[in-house]
Amino acid sequence: MNIDLINWISFAWQALLKNRDWMTWNLFLAVLPWALSLWLFGKPRSRWLRWGVVSLTVATFIPHASHALQSSLYILKYIKTSYLIWAIALTAVLMGFDRWKLKGARSRSLLWWLGFLVFIAFLPNAPYVLTDIIHLVEDIRFYDSIWLITLILIPQYLIFMGLGFQAYVLSLMRLGTYLETRGWKRFVVPAEFIVCALSAIGIYMGRFRRFNSWDLVTQPDRVVAITMDDLASQRPFWVTIVTFAVITGLYFLMKWVTESIGLAQQSRSMAVLSNK
């Protein structure tokens, strides 16, 4: 009996390790915009939250540091002139609008806008983790142990997808909070819908066309051309619409849950202070 248990634990551990590499990499890509939001939109009050985000980002990055370095070198080697022109032009337009809107006061720097473009480019990687459920289906078909599937694989995937999508929710919520502090509260909901729409397009292009975020740098012309061509086709268009509906619905649901938890914690803290 003990030998069987040890063998099962060893088998379960191997099943966990089988998904470790791609899960940690996808989770790093999902958490990266959240980490960027700490710099772009201001530090959160909770020190534990700040350290938690940084720790999770570092923990998911370290196993893939060499891969990330190779990707960075690839981008630098094959970066397109058209992308540089497009990025500089877009950044200049955004900075000009920012200075005009704020009359030069508290306007953001070039570095900030470049960071914001990276934030938007990588943000679709967070809800993208929901599509990794196809790997769970493959694992269920591969393994014949109901206990392994129920006790190990399903919890592993739920934690992975939950962390990734919650990173998306918190990143977008921080963007909304930032807009509110700048006096642009009326733009929060439209911005959320726009980001969800861009994320839906990014998810489709990533899952079906196998593009990734750095393809926007190395082959922007091809990405734009194929995206426009696909959106003009019926099947890709409706797949994108359904994806948009799913991630938008889940986002607002999880936003409500997150805000409710935050309000409950504030009420509890105020109650404790009033009793002292």
What kind of region is each of these model predictions?
Residues 31-42, 95-99, 162-179, 244-266:
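Transmembrane alpha-helical segments in integral membrane proteins
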Residues 26-42, 54-64, 83-100, 173:
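Central hydrophobic cores of alpha-helical transmembrane segments in multi-pass inner-membrane proteins
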Residues 5-30, 75-84:
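Hydrophobic transmembrane alpha-helical segments in integral membrane proteins
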Residues 57-69, 116-133:
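A generic, lipid-embedded transmembrane alpha helix
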Residues 113-124, 191-209:
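Hydrophobic alpha-helical membrane-insertion segments
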Residues 40-51, 99-111, 177-186:
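Membrane-interface helix-boundary motifs at transmembrane edges
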Residues 201-223:
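Juxtamembrane non-transmembrane "cap" segments at the membrane-aqueous interface
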Residues 15-24, 151-153, 212, 222-249:
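Membrane-interface transmembrane-helix boundary segments in multi-pass integral membrane proteins
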